[in-house]
Amino acid sequence: MESKLALSQLSALAQENRLAVFRLLVKAGPDGLPAGEIAVALNVPPNTLSAQLNILSNAGLIEGARQGRSIIYTANYDAISGLIVFLMEDCCQGRAEVCTPIMAAAQSACC
């Protein structure tokens, strides 16, 4: 991953509503959620949510797919993995025991 992409993704997450949207979509899993449900769940006006979804989408962190009249948004798990790997590359000067708690926490958070 290029530093520029990592900065774009981290910047997209560095706002309260966008971080909440992202976390909600991660929690929703691969089935995702329609934009309307996201707006209701987070109590965000639809026009505000639309702008936030565009920023997250442009950063590659989420994807939207039209299903009938709705757009279903999902977290881009490949992008998330890439960002985590980028952040953890060359971690701890090769001392795996330092990274073990981080990896254990990540595994326990997953389904």
List PLM regions with ranges:
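Short intrinsically disordered, low-complexity segments
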Residues: E16, I55, A109-C110
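Short, Lys/Arg-enriched C-terminal cap helix and immediately downstream tail that follows
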Residues: G60-I62, G68-R69, V85-F86
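N-terminal helix-turn-helix DNA-binding core of bacterial DNA-binding proteins
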Residues: K4-P45, Q67, I71-A79
